[in-house]
UniProtKB/Swiss-Prot annotation:
Tissue-specific expression: Root specific.
Residues binding xyloglucan: 105, 118-120, 128-130, 194-195, 199, 273
Modification note: Contains at least one intrachain disulfide bond essential for its enzymatic activity.
Keywords assigned: Apoplast, Cell wall, Cell wall biogenesis/degradation, Disulfide bond, Glycoprotein, Glycosidase, Hydrolase, Secreted, Signal, Transferase
Induction: Strongly down-regulated by abscisic acid (ABA).
Signal peptide positions (record): 1-25
Encoding gene per record: XTH12
BP terms from Gene Ontology: cell wall biogenesis; cell wall organization; xyloglucan metabolic process
A GO molecular-function descriptor: hydrolase activity, hydrolyzing O-glycosyl compounds
Descriptive protein name: Probable xyloglucan endotransglucosylase/hydrolase protein 12
Domain of life (superkingdom): Eukaryota
Gene3D superfamilies the record matches: 2.60.120.200
Catalytic activity reported: breaks a beta-(1->4) bond in the backbone of a xyloglucan and transfers the xyloglucanyl segment on to O-4 of the non-reducing terminal glucose residue of an acceptor, which can be a xyloglucan or an oligosaccharide of xyloglucan
Source lineage: Eukaryota, Viridiplantae, Streptophyta, Embryophyta, Tracheophyta
Xref: CDD domains: GH16_XET
Length: 285
């Protein structure tokens, strides 16, 4: 292993949504820094955002808009060096006790050991759908693009355009799918050394603080979004758009490559965790 490693009715959608075709501008326009007491900052006229973590606090931000389906890109440069115990989270989530959520979490490690990408999908407040991966590059050396493509057919997680995971809409087989709760984008840098690195065996070395993750090139040009409950600004849901995208044959090959060579945990093969039987979708995918 590498070292661094049910289609909804268009009429229904149209009743909710209208057309957006412009790329997002600066981080000032798209996000609010929500916590961290000055540890998250925007630079370069809104083109760069950084989150920092020290022993006192981490930091985070969230999108101004909500999304109901979308193709959302963010370039992230992760915490370099000894990042053990740190988590850089980048995810979409709705509100309430029965929330939906689509997660990227980047689990730090000691110097020279690989980051872990932790992914999960929550529906109606229920998760337990973790898949974890190493990467085929050093994610701290430069910015790389992390994408969530979420439409009525599937949720696709991509890294630099390469799919690493697909969660399909299997509602017809009794599997819940996030399709009705708008979500905001959230990101944060925080400490979780009780579980994040090697199951909590390696703790955060605070002599390396402050830790910092950087963000560029946020893009939500292909999305269904709203700025308030009464003001939907939305997407082109025609048959040729991202709204009905699934993996093509080349992407399926890429997915198989990643899952063969870089996947380190798959809930769908964890029989000890699910002694009464694997979740339904595991037998369908």
């Amino acid at each position: 292993m590498a070292a661094f490693a049910t289609k909804q009715s268009p009429l229904l959608l149209a009743s909710l949504l209208i057309l957006i075709g412009v790329a997002t501008g600066s981080f000032y326009d798209s996000f609010d820094i929500t916590w961290g007491a000055g540890r998250a900052n925007i630079f370069e006229s809104g083109q760069l955002l950084t989150c920092t973590l020290d022993k006192t606090s981490g930091s985070g931000f969230q999108s101004k808009k909500e999304y109901l389906f979308g193709k959302i890109d963010m370039k992230i440069k992760l915490v370099p060096g000894n990042s053990a115990g740190t988590v850089t989270a980048y995810y979409l989530s709705s509100k309430g006790e029965t929330w939906d959520e689509i997660d990227f979490e980047f689990l730090g490690n000691v110097t020279g050991q690989p980051y872990v990408i932790h992914t999960n999908v929550f529906t109606g407040g229920k998760g337990n759908r973790e898949m974890q991966f190493y990467l085929w590059f050093d994610p701290t050396a430069d910015f790389h693009t992390y994408t969530v493509l979420w439409n009525p057919l599937n949720i696709i997680f991509l890294v630099d355009g390469i799919p690493i995971r697909v969660f399909k809409n299997n509602e017809a087989n009794g599997v819940a799918y996030p399709k009705s709760q708008p979500m905001k984008i959230y990101s944060s840098l925080w400490e979780a050394d009780d579980w994040a690195t090697q199951g909590g065996k390696v703790k955060t070395d605070w002599t390396n603080a402050p830790f910092s993750a950087s963000y560029r090139s946020f893009n939500d040009v292909d999305c269904c979004s709203r700025t308030s409950i009464w003001n939907w600004v939305t997407c082109n849901a025609n048959s040729n758009s991202w709204m009905w995208t699934t993996l093509n044959s080349n992407q399926l090959g890429q997915l198989k490559w990643v899952q063969k060579d870089y996947m380190i945990y798959n809930y769908c093969t964890d029989f000890k965790r699910f002694p009464q039987g694997l979740p339904t979708e595991c037998n369908l995918n």
